[in-house]
Amino acid sequence: MRRQLLLLALLCALCGAERAAAQYYTWGSDPPQKWSAIRTPDVRMIYPDTVAGIARRTLFYIRSVRPDIGYGFRHGPMRIPFVMHPENFQSNGLVMYLPKRVEFLTSPAVDSYSMPWYKQLVAHEYRHAVQYNNLDRGVIRALSYVLGQQGSTIGLLCMPIWAMEGDAVMSETMHSSFGRGLQPSFSMAYRAMGSVGRDRRNIDRWFCGSYRDYIPDHYELGYQICSYAWERYGENIWDKVAWYGSRNPYVLATTRVALGKFYKTNVIKLFRETFDELERYWDSLPETGDSAVPLTALPEKNHTTYQWPLPLGDTAVVALKTDLDRVSRFVVIDRRTGGERTVCHTGLVSTRPSMADGRVWWTEYRRSTLFEQRVNSQLCYMDLADGVPRTAERQRNTLYPTASGEEFGWVEYNPDGRYTVVVRHGEGPERRFETPVRSEIHGLAWDDRTVAWYVLVTDDSGMWIGRIDSDGLHPITEGAYITLSNLRAGGGKLYYGSIASGRDEAHCYDLMARREYRITTSAYGSFAPAPADGGVLLTTYDRLGYRVAEQRVAADDSLLIPVTPSRLPVNLVNPPRKRWDVVNLDTVRYTRADSVGQSGEFRAKRYRKVPNLVNAHSWMPVAFNPFAAVDEHVIDLNVGLTLISQNLLSSAEAYASYGWNRHEGSLVNLGVRYFGLGVRFDLDASYGGNQLFYSLAGRDGQGNPVYQSRPAPDKYYSVGLSATLPLYFQRGYHTRQLSLSAGWNYSNGMVADLGKIEWENGSISNIQRVGFREGLHKVSFGAGFSDQVRMAHRDIAPRWGYTFSANYTFNPENTHFSDLISFYGQAYLPGFAPHNSVLVAATYQTSIGGYKFPSGYAPLSYKSTRLVPRGFTSADIVSNNYTAFQANYQLPVWYPEGGIGSVIYIKRIRLNAGGDYAQFRDVGRGGMTWRRIWSVGGDIVFDFNAFRQPASATSTFKLSCYHPSSGG
């Protein structure tokens, strides 16, 4: 029976592992704060009190869009809670099961378009709630009664992720004036690549990504296919795909069958038709070239991105550079030769840099020390003279730093949704300029000629530019649903990116003449203009990436192209598509009257954390440990029942199981984890099975083995509690972690009573009368520290990194038990070629104190399983001066980018060659002697994607072959 259950679990894992990776997700804990909830007939808003206003506004948008959000599907959105996280600058949103909820990161995205962030989130994420509701029908709904929400997740296999995201981007686009899918940059990579649809190789690379080349993500791909299918068939094809799949989940490849059954098509045909049509449309557009002169060359097969170029004198440029081989770093480019040098590596940059007097300022995303859902935007700086990146103290909520001679300005974002422009003159006091409520700031610039600060604003009217001072915010341009970006200023002009012409181009606004001009003409796009002597520095895009370029500007502005104000950009690069008959969220206004009316209709109540810690969302008719299955990939199944719980705040997880097998009888297990205070607490308890014995063995006078007699075993039980303090120190290019832990465990194991041993002629004379003591306590303390650098797209391990840890374990109740002390260290080093990796590791452990035989052997001792030579188990070693070493060399050997179409796509094959060596003192016939074991061999590792899952769901499969040897 257990073998059959295990086989069933493996088959389910093969079918659903990738989708589970996206949906079985622990979001991470927020810092401690007070929470409230608003319940309506359709949704429940759960939010910290600091964002009560944002929660009310978001609820208003949800209720406004609800009648239309299910457009094209036969069922509307499911009833689902929305959980808001206000202290994470890495803006995002997710809809997931286990438990069912919508997660909103409320900090507006830095790189956004002309629709306010909360409207974007509602239009996109609430559409996922529609998809989930249409998949949770028929057989899938029946499975949810058997398995809880785990049963509903099986329905997610019946609609591809790229289709779900593409349909959600369509919703986001159709519920706005000029939304995400219509942005020129959203199709730019495909336009630059050319013949995507005629690619006759395995098309899975376009769905699953590549290590060879840059591939647009599944949002961009999904939108193009979904929008074409709507136009081609005149309806939402995914409605029937979801309907068929939810009622026939036992059919292999439900998407393929449904598309063939209802539309006489398939994914390959849709893909090729989509991009054939797009290419024909793009080829019909007037051909244009780049007016800007490139300053850098881009290599083949290493998609390169230069960002935010800034002038450094007359002969050099400072820019941020990233490519597939290396992470982001600041480089200095010689304008005359195109040569460059690296100045310093950075962390994940959040907003564009600024430079004055040889110092570069920028901001980076930095996770807080304790809480995963507190991610700051940290102000950083670097002097070009020494190239050392530094962190500015107490500047964690900073955006758009702007250096301007004696003044330095930045934008502060408060978790309650308010933006403030802060200006400091030298060492003087700060001046703070508040911005209007319900507006977002997406840029800051200082103009030396008008001696004023300017901001880029997004609100219900779209995007516009304003001047800010102590009297408030004064509009310079009118609001329009035209995306503006990367605001800079100088010489009486504002410079920024704009999509007014239908492509991303560099624009400027003459503050004296009050006129807007287009500076560039581009084949695909020009970005991030910055004024330089006699011209403008910017980046242009082509199939190889973003390159630094320079646009010369005539002194009389005769080369500038006047721009006529408009509420919408030219829809140039998108083929005609019929719009949905849905509400345009750009026309929805949340007023004070709406706030008062909603507060009266739906009152907020305190959301108590303790009563909501337990939230049983799933159950299974088998007994297993889900923590071990996820963390250690260990699946031990028994007949029985398992309940799984996770609270909506992602601060507590738990499971309880009852199982039975014929060897051990009834088995009861409980596991609880809590993360809400920064310290992680783990509680585990078990009951059932046979009591464990820690008994003695010896030899009689003839050398034959003699074992201690055991009484009949009782039922086994154990309980354990541990606490771990993970401290996270993110410092740009380096991420350091310090972990402190303490744990206690008690079990009713039967331990040999060593105090009653009698020795005669070097052997135990009363081994059958020694007896046992019930109960085994284990207390452990540990500390670990690691430091690793960021990994590039093609890296298989960090180029540099190290880990050190030390642990101490003892039994406080039984002095006959030896204490265990152990140390471990490992290091990552670069190999002989790019993306080759060397891993070396070493460990030492030994037992100290406790009862020892005359030979020196400690019969009662603990062991660490860290670094046991491959091919051996912990039963083969003794924790007596145990020393082990390991060395591995790993390298990529092939990027096949092929496989079985739509089933498995192999992206990369890696080879690892390794060897292990260990030695320790063990008891022998002549007393304690050194024993040595070793192993050599290798691993073949396949990086693959199953069932056209996106690049983020890449998995690994490893084949290992090692030759162990006792060595002597």
Language-model segments: residues:
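Outer-membrane beta-barrel initiation region
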Residues: 287, 302, 558-678, 769-799, ...
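Multi-bladed beta-propeller domains
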Residues: 284-304, 333-350, 381-404, 424-447, ...
